[in-house]
Structures are given as structure tokens and as C-alpha cells.
């Protein structure tokens, strides 16, 4: 049986607490709670991963370090899996910025991937750097019949959701409405013909039904953490 690809959001960062659009690496560090979240995540796993990777962002590296310490595994940094780049909205925490970020993200979820964050990335930009990393991991490891361990990749909420839904065909209203809390994960399993199946999304398992009434901008404005 092939291993799985586990995409876990980093632990709580100071940027999350401050409700900042903190997307440009290296970015904010983990809070004390974020460190504990990373340790708890590792302790909740039954088996150690065969490979532990993280993005270039400081909060992802720190999360991976804590996980690696629990498993006595050295993490490695990977380019291309950092957060959606907010551009002109970077480091802002005002309602206008949060609303604009989530409005653009909603358009991506609805198929308008060419739309860009002001001064930042489009959905196509994000996928063009993120998906090749996952494809490479599949070809090098998961498609090998002798590889049976999971690959754990510490990344970022908005990027994880977009990439995972694209690969596994998760319905757009579902992934738009279901953010990932700190150290929650999406679990992908390789299936036939190069396709992927999503077997876990945060605390949820399939089927991932469409959400009839989603309000991502309003929800983000009310959320303690508008990212994820």
C-alpha cells in the first residue's frame, strides 16, 4: 500500500494572532501555543513520516522542527509551497484588506484563476509553483510500490486548500467554506491514472458535500484568524 501525502498547516504564528495577512517569507514566528500545537500534532500520529518537509516560511520551519524533534527526524526545506502572496495587502489587518484577499480567493475557487491579488499572485501562479512539488513527490516516492510511509509537508492554509481541491476535485463551495485551523491537515492518497483522492480535510472525511450557502468574506471578517 502506498503512503499518503499529509499537508499540514503550520502552528499558530504571531501574524495569526494579530490577524495580519502575513504571507511574504520569512514571516512571523510561532507563538508558544503554536509550538505546543506542533508537538501535539506529532504526538497524535501513530507512525513517523518517511519524509518531513516544510516551506521557506519561518513558522512552517519551526512547526516542522518541533514535529521532527518528536519523531527524531530531520526536516527539509522545499521551495514552492509557501503561502499565497498577498502583494499590496501584505501585513495588513484591516477589514478592507481581509475582505479583498478573501474576495479574490473566492473567485479562484469559482474558477477565475487568472485573477490576481493586488500586486500579488493569481491562482494560476500559486498552482504553477505548488503542484509540481506534489507531483514530484508522488513520482519519486508515492508511486514506488516499495514506499509505504507517509510524506508530511508543513505548509499554509490558503495554498493547501487551493492545491488539494484542485488535485482531488473537491467541490469548490466545500473547500471555500472549510478553512484549516493551525496544525489541521489535508490528507491525499494517490490513485490510478495520476489522480488523487482526498481522504481527510481537517476534522472531516468524505463525502465532501457542496455547501449551499457560503459567505467567505463575511466569515473572514468575523474570524479570529482570517487566514487558513
Model-assigned labels for residue ranges:
Residues 66, 162-166:
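Active-site signature of alpha/beta-hydrolase-fold catalytic machinery across serine-
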Amino acid at each position: 500500500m502506498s503512503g499518503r501525502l499529509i499537508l499540514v498547516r503550520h502552528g499558530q504564528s504571531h501574524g495569526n494572532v494579530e490577524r495580519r495577512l502575513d504571507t511574504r517569507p520569512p514571516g512571523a514566528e510561532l507563538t508558544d501555543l503554536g509550538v505546543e500545537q506542533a508537538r501535539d500534532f506529532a504526538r497524535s500520529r501513530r507512525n513517523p513520516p518517511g519524509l518531513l518537509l516544510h516551506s521557506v516560511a519561518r513558522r512552517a520551519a519551526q512547526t516542522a522542527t518541533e514535529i521532527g524533534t518528536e519523531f527524531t527526524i530531520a526536516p527539509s526545506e522545499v521551495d514552492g509551497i509557501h503561502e499565497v502572496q498577498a502583494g499590496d495587502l501584505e501585513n495588513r489587518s484591516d477589514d478592507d484588506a481581509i475582505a479583498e484577499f478573501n474576495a479574490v480567493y473566492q473567485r479562484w475557487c469559482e474558477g477565475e484563476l487568472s485573477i490576481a491579488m493586488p500586486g500579488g499572485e493569481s491562482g494560476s501562479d500559486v498552482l504553477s509553483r505548488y503542484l509540481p512539488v506534489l507531483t514530484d513527490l508522488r513520482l519519486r516516492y508515492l508511486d514506488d510500490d516499495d514506499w509505504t510511509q507517509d510524506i508530511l509537508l508543513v505548509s499554509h492554509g490558503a495554498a493547501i486548500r487551493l492545491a488539494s481541491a484542485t488535485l482531488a476535485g473537491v467541490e469548490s463551495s466545500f473547500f471555500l467554506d472549510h478553512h484549516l485551523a493551525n496544525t489541521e491537515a489535508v490528507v491525499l492518497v494517490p490513485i490510478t491514472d495520476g489522480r488523487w483522492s482526498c481522504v481527510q480535510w481537517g476534522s472531516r472525511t468524505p463525502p465532501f458535500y457542496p455547501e449551499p450557502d457560503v459567505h467567505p468574506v463575511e466569515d473572514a471578517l468575523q474570524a479570529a484568524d482570517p487566514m487558513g
